[in-house]
């Protein structure tokens, strides 16, 4: 059995050992961590082992090589700024002299500015500079010909008038026109006034026509003269040669008999229209109990009596109506 060496001899042998192999270093790792004497030389010994292993492993191509660890290089700040101080200050002056067009408030109040030469404001009247014009830095087009303010105002007024005239065509048809409009617009009838909602009143450029009683001169009324005769059918006959005339009122207007006609004469039979005229007539009325009739009114405000001659009649006699005939209502329409 081999005799074991004391611990002191083993420690001395380990400190003086020339074994630089990776196995020896690994076997002594526990001892290096527990022995204080070994810790001091472990760093230097490890560097030597790495350099030796690198030299040995360089000859073998199949062995994996550890990457070399290089120390971080820290460059001082003084070496980073390679430009000298004089050059830095001169470039700052050249750069900021363009902006020294106002006095520095801090330098004017306290006599000291923390920015020193880097300040963009002037430190005193000697550094104060006049601002340069824009033409020196930027190329500008030649100045345009200036016009008088009055001519420009006239152009603006013309543009406004054109825009307002184009907008007025679509805004409202009853808008009050200007003086340059023709008088043809006055001949048109205001439809808003007929509906009763014209907001322009007398200032409207369209005609405000009051709805008055219009009478059709081609209308003829056929009715029984008295209650003694059998009740025939009353017709409102409109002659076909005047059918193109439009009567804008829903109810027909009847004509009064002439004043020179004989009162109380029987209603002539020949005045009843023929069959073809009845087919061309517009409405047909049933015999109802009348209460009032419309009568035309002349310029003096008095009822005006008129006469109508039926061209289809065989004789030349006039139509005769009894007293109070036109004070009764018209007959109802048979639908």
UniProtKB/Swiss-Prot annotation:
UniProt cross-references to SUPFAM superfamilies, sorted A to Z? CCCH zinc finger
Which Pfam families is this protein grouped with? zf-CCCH
Explain the post-translational modification: Sumoylated in adult germ cells.
Keywords per UniProt: Cytoplasm, Cytoskeleton, DNA-binding, Isopeptide bond, Metal-binding, Nucleus, Repeat, Repressor, Transcription, Transcription regulation, Ubl conjugation, Zinc, Zinc-finger
Q: Where is the composition biased (Polar residues)?
A: 158-167, 177-187
* Zn finger (C3H1-type) location: 98-126, 184-211
What does UniProt say about this protein's domains? The C3H1-type 1 domain is required for degradation in somatic blastomeres.
Protein name, as recorded: Pharynx and intestine in excess protein 1
Q: Which organism is it from?
A: Caenorhabditis elegans
Q: What is the lineage of its organism?
A: Eukaryota, Metazoa, Ecdysozoa, Nematoda, Chromadorea
Gene that encodes the chain = pie-1
């Amino acid at each position: 059995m081999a005799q074991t060496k004391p611990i002191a001899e083993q420690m001395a042998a380990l400190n003086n050992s020339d074994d630089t192999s990776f196995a020896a270093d690994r076997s002594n790792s526990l001892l290096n961590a527990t022995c204080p004497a070994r810790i001091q030389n472990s760093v230097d010994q490890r560097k030597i082992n790495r350099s030796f292993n690198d030299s040995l492993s360089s000859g073998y191509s199949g062995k994996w090589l550890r990457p070399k660890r290089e120390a971080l290089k820290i460059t001082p700040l003084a070496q980073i700024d390679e430009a000298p101080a004089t050059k830095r200050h001169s470039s700052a002056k050249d750069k900021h002299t363009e902006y020294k067009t106002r006095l520095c408030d801090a330098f004017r109040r306290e006599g000291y500015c923390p920015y020193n030469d880097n300040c963009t404001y002037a430190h005193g009247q000697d550094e104060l500079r006049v601002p340069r014009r824009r033409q020196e830095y930027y190329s500008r087009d030649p100045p345009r010909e200036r016009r008088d303010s009055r001519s420009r105002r006239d152009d603006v007024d013309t543009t406004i008038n054109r825009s307002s005239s184009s907008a007025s065509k679509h805004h409202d048809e009853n808008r009050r026109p200007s003086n340059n409009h023709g008088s043809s617009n006055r001949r048109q009838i205001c439809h808003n006034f007929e509906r009763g909602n014209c907001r322009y009143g007398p200032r409207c450029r369209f005609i405000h026509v009051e709805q008055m009683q219009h009478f059709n001169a081609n209308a003829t009324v056929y009715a029984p003269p008295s209650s003694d005769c059998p009740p025939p059918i009353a017709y409102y006959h409109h002659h076909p040669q005047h059918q193109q005339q439009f009567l804008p009122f829903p109810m027909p207007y009847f004509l009064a008999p002439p004043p020179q006609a004989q009162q109380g004469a029987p209603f002539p039979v020949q005045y009843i229209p023929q069959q073809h005229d009845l087919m061309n007539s517009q409405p047909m009325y049933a015999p109802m109990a009348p209460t009032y009739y419309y009568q035309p009114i002349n310029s003096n405000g008095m009822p005006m009596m008129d006469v109508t001659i039926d061209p289809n009649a065989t004789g030349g006699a006039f139509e005769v109506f009894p007293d109070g005939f036109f004070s009764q209502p018209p007959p109802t329409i048979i639908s």
